[in-house]
Every structure is written in C-alpha cells, then in structure tokens.
Amino acid sequence: MNILEICQEVADITSTQRPTDLFNGKLQHDSIFLSVAKAELSSLMRYGDWQDLTKEATLLTVKNKTVYPIDNIVPDFYSILNNTVYIKDDMEKVIGAITPEDWMREKYFSCPDANIKFKIQGNAIKFLEAPEGGKRIVFQYRSNAVCYDGTTFEEKPTITKNTDIPIFDKYVVQLGITWRWLKRNGMDYTEEYNEYEEELRKKFGTGLATKDINLAVGEIDLADSGVIIDVKTGK
C-alpha cells in the first residue's frame, strides 16, 4: 500500500474528503495530509533501532588518517548501533562511540592499549589514534530511509511521490497519520493516539525480540545480547 492509499484510508476513517494528489501543492487539504505523513514517517525513523533499518557497512582504514566523513561510507546513515563495531577477520573489537569526557581522558591521561576508540562528531567517525592502514572495520547502523520507490524499490529518506511505499508497518503508519491529522485540525485525538502508541510499542518490541545473534566472532557474551542459554540443557 503506497502513501497516497494510506492517506485515503485515513480520510475514510476520519470522514473527510479523500486526497487525490499529495504533491499537487494547490489544495490545502492534500498538503495537510502530506505534512502529517512526512511527520509520521520521520518520527518512526527516529523512534528506535528498527530491524528493517539496520544495515551493515565497511570502513577501510587509511594509514595516518583519523577522520572519516560518514557520508563517504554510507550516504543513508542516521546513527551507529553501539557495540556492533568489529575489525573484520580479527578478534579485536573496536570500542563503541565514547563520550566527550572519555575522549579527553583517553587522549591525555590513559596508557595506550589494544583497543581502537572513536567518536561520532560533525557527521564523521573520528578515531582517537589512527588505526593501521588497510583494516576493514565493519559496523551496523540505522538507515535514515523512511520509504522506497514503488517502481524502482530504491530506499528514500523522504516521500516524494504518491506511489512511495513506507518501510514501516502500514497499520502503524495509518494510525500515526490519523491522530496527527486529527490534532492538526483541532479535533480530539486521545483515543487514536493511545491506540497508536500501543500498536507502535508492540511492533517495535517484536523487532527487538527477533534480532540476529552474531555467531561469527570468537566469543559471544550471551548475557549482553539479551539471550541466556543454559549450557546444560541448551535452552
């Protein structure tokens, strides 16, 4: 179901006129639907680490280089998933993004160790010390995509066509557009908002429960992964 069809269903639910072209720009009615649809998709993208938005990227280090613009690595980057950064084909783990306080402490007061530390600043990955050249550092990140083109299936950071299809659960998107439309038009939206929040938590929680367990590394702390296996029973 594309974004226009979802908005038309919302119009039916709220007993209002159906939008015919979200991008016409001439009808205020259609423009309001476009505005709330964009707000809803943007809000969902920022809500959390959706499994549908989780991707893997590889950074190839260059000798003596400490700063790597993220756009050069992954143009659709929104945020890095902490504790998912590894040196490929190596047992060494790169410590996750550190706080400004940790950065200064490590830079000026700590003794060097085997870990590679970095921070995210100015839309770039900045290493505390330049890693060796030629290291392949892989990490998972959250994409900024909210929809994909209904024809080419290209992922996009915003809707630009009536036929664009939201990445997120269509029912959640419908509920979100519904309460936002009611609010925008000065109507009571309490019931719709509560239903939306309940469904959103349910869908997001389902994604968390089905996250992959990485079996490629030498050691796995299953307690940290949120999954505990009894060694004796295997359960």
Residue ranges of model-derived segments:
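Glycine-enriched, solvent-exposed interface loops adjoining structured elements
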Residues: 1-235
